[in-house]
């Protein structure tokens, strides 16, 4: 029997846990992330996000109206000092089916990337190939990653600032060859809530030391900027995420998304914001109620 929370859990902790389960279930329902018969490879780094994702999926597995299989996976990249025993011991104690994959990507990254440069890009590409191969070997058709709402917003700004693109992390993505769907069940979950939950669960966290000082990374700078905005005006990060879910192509400038050249004068368009007020009463994307069975049944089961 899987132990979902500590024996001495407070009411506030249980409320937080239920909130995270609800947000995870809602994201899964909104994007149809999980279907009957799925085998899901749950990627575990040993950080707070992947631990939380696994626990949310295990909780939902017990009450979901569909049957799906979970296989936890950790990639041991042979970093010096990496505590290789921690995740296997935890997953065995939890009673979760798992696979530990050993691959010395650390040496490759150190050989290819000059000292002091960011290793994330190459490391990510190497990890991705190994994850896809492992999913194929295990017969998984879905790959679950632990990215949360704040990761998605940070990625939007990273791509705008450094790539001149309005591009974030989709909650669900088909791989290039169409073999797998990559899903992000924590897409609706705030990082601060995940951090609080992880502290309450006392997960055996494994820090990421491969990249060196995280403060020097572009992502950390964007994270600091967003945290400053959030302190100045609470709720701003969530509003940005809601905007990602509520795009109006006719009010942007991408000719691939909207046919500006052949736009008919007789066609009714939304009011130009230059001449009208900002729509403060627009329906937030996260309040949309799906008629899909997963979320309807999920809500019924936790009531």
UniProtKB/Swiss-Prot annotation:
Annotated localization: Cytoplasm
Highest taxon of source: Bacteria
Role, per record: Catalyzes the ATP-dependent 2-thiolation of cytidine in position 32 of tRNA, to form 2-thiocytidine (s(2)C32). The sulfur atoms are provided by the cysteine/cysteine desulfurase (IscS) system.
HAMAP family named among the record's database cross-references: TtcA
SUPFAM superfamilies hit by this protein: Adenine nucleotide alpha hydrolases-like
InterPro entries: Rossmann-like_a/b/a_fold, TilS/TtcA_N, tRNA_Cyd_32_2_STrfase, tRNA_thiolation_TtcA_Ctu1
Residue positions binding [4Fe-4S] cluster: 120, 123, 211
E.C. code: 2.8.1.-
Designated name of the protein: tRNA-cytidine(32) 2-sulfurtransferase
Note, other: The thiolation reaction likely consists of two steps: a first activation step by ATP to form an adenylated intermediate of the target base of tRNA, and a second nucleophilic substitution step of the sulfur (S) atom supplied by the hydrosulfide attached to the Fe-S cluster.
Molecular function in Gene Ontology: 4 iron, 4 sulfur cluster binding; ATP binding; magnesium ion binding; sulfurtransferase activity; tRNA binding
Catalytic activity: cytidine(32) in tRNA + S-sulfanyl-L-cysteinyl-[cysteine desulfurase] + AH2 + ATP = 2-thiocytidine(32) in tRNA + L-cysteinyl-[cysteine desulfurase] + A + AMP + diphosphate + H(+)
One Pfam family, short name: ATP_bind_3
Pathway info: tRNA modification
GO cellular component assignments: cytoplasm
Keywords from the named record: 4Fe-4S, ATP-binding, Cytoplasm, Iron, Iron-sulfur, Magnesium, Metal-binding, Nucleotide-binding, RNA-binding, Transferase, tRNA processing, tRNA-binding
Cofactor requirement: Mg(2+); [4Fe-4S] cluster
Motif position, PP-loop motif: 45-50
Disulfide topology: none
Entry's transmembrane regions: none
Cofactor note: Binds 1 [4Fe-4S] cluster per subunit. The cluster is chelated by three Cys residues, the fourth Fe has a free coordination site that may bind a sulfur atom transferred from the persulfide of IscS.
Gene (UniProt): ttcA
Keyword Magnesium: yes
Complexes and interactors: Homodimer.
CDD domains reported in the protein's UniProt record: TtcA-like (cd24138)
């Amino acid at each position: 029997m899987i132990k979902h929370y500590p024996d001495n859990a407070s009411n506030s902790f249980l409320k937080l846990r239920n909130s995270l389960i609800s947000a995870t279930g809602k994201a899964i329902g909104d994007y149809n992330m999980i279907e009957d018969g799925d085998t899901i490879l749950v990627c575990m780094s040993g950080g707070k996000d992947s631990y939380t994702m696994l626990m949310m999926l295990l909780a939902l597995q017990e009450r979901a109206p569909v049957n799906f299989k979970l296989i936890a996976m950790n990639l041991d990249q042979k970093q010096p000092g990496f505590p290789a025993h921690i995740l296997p011991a935890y997953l065995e104690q939890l009673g979760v089916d798992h696979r530990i994959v050993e691959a010395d990507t650390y040496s490759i990254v150190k050989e290819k990337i000059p000292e002091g440069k960011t290793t994330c890009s190459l490391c990510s590409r190497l990890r991705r190939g190994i994850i896809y191969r492992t999913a194929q070997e295990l017969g998984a058709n879905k790959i679950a990653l632990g990215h949360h709402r704040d990761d998605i917003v940070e990625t939007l700004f990273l791509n705008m600032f450094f790539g001149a693109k309005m591009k974030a992390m989709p909650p669900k993505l088909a791989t290039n060859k169409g073999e797998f769907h990559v899903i992000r069940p924590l897409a609706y979950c705030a990082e601060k809530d995940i951090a609080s939950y992880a502290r309450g669960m006392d997960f055996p966290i494994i820090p990421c030391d491969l990249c060196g000082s995280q403060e020097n990374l572009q992502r950390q700078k964007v994270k600091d900027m967003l945290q400053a905005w959030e302190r100045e005006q609470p709720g701003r990060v969530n509003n940005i995420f809601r905007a990602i879910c509520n795009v109006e192509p006719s009010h942007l400038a991408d000719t691939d998304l909207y046919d500006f050249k052949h736009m008919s004068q007789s066609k009714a368009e939304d009011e130009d914001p230059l001449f009208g007020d900002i729509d403060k009463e627009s329906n937030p994307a996260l309040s949309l109620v799906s008629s899909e069975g997963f979320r309807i049944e999920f809500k019924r089961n936790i009531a």
